[in-house]
């Protein structure tokens, strides 16, 4: 009887040990998963790790997968045929963008009379009629009759106290200061010059000429330079690269050319003079020397880095040109056609609304993920997370 009890006790002890081992294994597995999640979260918050991961993913773009390599030769031949069709699609797409450029050139001529009248109003060479000044206010912007009359009286009183302004003073400077992309370029010493900016125009290349556009900055006579117009020309290309035709995604800016600014004496804001004290090693005497060095200024925009014939640029020059191309495109596509809305800030509010909507969508998605984690006891983030995606621009 004692032997039986001992045997049963031994079996129970073995079962308990197995249960303990199972629990320890489960706990060890949970600890490993928790540590893995913590490590992943730390890595994703490290900019250097993210940059290295992005670079690795970029290197993988265009790399054939194992599946493609394993295909039979006859299937690979058919895939090659599809690639040849894709190249022809890229060539047709290039022609499409060339025709779009021609349409832009055609419609620019239709827009120009309106832009000229805009310039006349800004620069006080034309006074709009009462009818032209009427603007229907949105209901949200409208106010009660009493408040409206009071505001009108106060406005008239202020106008009487002030000197009668001509046109719309500092129109383009206000536009620049309202747009982050441009305000970052404008230094305090640039502002007195930009107050003399009368107009910005875009001119497209003539029919049959290589694709390009020129930004023209028109200035009234001023104390800083003799130029009436400062120009910046962007050369474009709309054709697939023979060495990498699948990278074609529309016209790209290949380079840009600025202009020489004829600065008046002592007025060049792109340069500054600094003084340094130098001590003679032997005699110990000190002398002061002056040196002219580059200075941050919006007007450096008209002196972009030159692209070498081999197309290779150092990192600094490449970063400057990339930002330059973005600014040139933004001026052409947004600022020039819609300048009054950037002057009033309405276009900026629209841009902010777009970003807010994206942010709300992202918040909603995060909320759904958190709900899944709370409601599902078996939820594991690593099973739901998608691998990082790399999109070619």
UniProtKB/Swiss-Prot annotation:
Motif mapping: NAP1L motif: 126-151
GO cellular component, one term: nucleus
Signal peptide annotation: none
Molecular functions (GO terms): cyclin binding; histone binding; identical protein binding
Keywords on record: Cytoplasm, Developmental protein, Differentiation, Nucleus, Phosphoprotein, Spermatogenesis, Transcription, Transcription regulation
Motif mapping: Nuclear localization signal: 274-280
Chain residue ranges for the region called Disordered: 1-36, 132-165, 347-393
InterPro entries: NAP-like_sf (IPR037231), NAP_family (IPR002164)
Composition bias type Acidic residues, residue spans: 11-30, 132-144, 347-378
Source species, domain of life: Eukaryota
Residue spans of biased composition, Basic and acidic residues class: 1-10, 145-165, 379-393
Pfam families membership: NAP
Localization terms from the record: Cytoplasm; Nucleus
Domain notes: The NAP1L motif is required for the histone chaperone activity. The acidic domains are probably involved in the interaction with histones.
Record's function text: Acts as a chaperone for the linker histone to facilitate deposition of histone B4 onto linker DNA. Required for both remodeling of sperm chromatin into nucleosomes, and linker histone binding to nucleosome core dimers. Plays a role in tissue-specific gene regulation. Required for primitive hemopoiesis, acting upstream of tal1/scl.
Subunit and interaction comment: Forms homomultimers. Interacts with histone B4. Interacts with the B-type cyclins ccnb1 and ccnb2.
Entry similarity comment: Belongs to the nucleosome assembly protein (NAP) family.
Protein's UniProt name: Nucleosome assembly protein 1-like 1
Species this chain originates from: Xenopus tropicalis
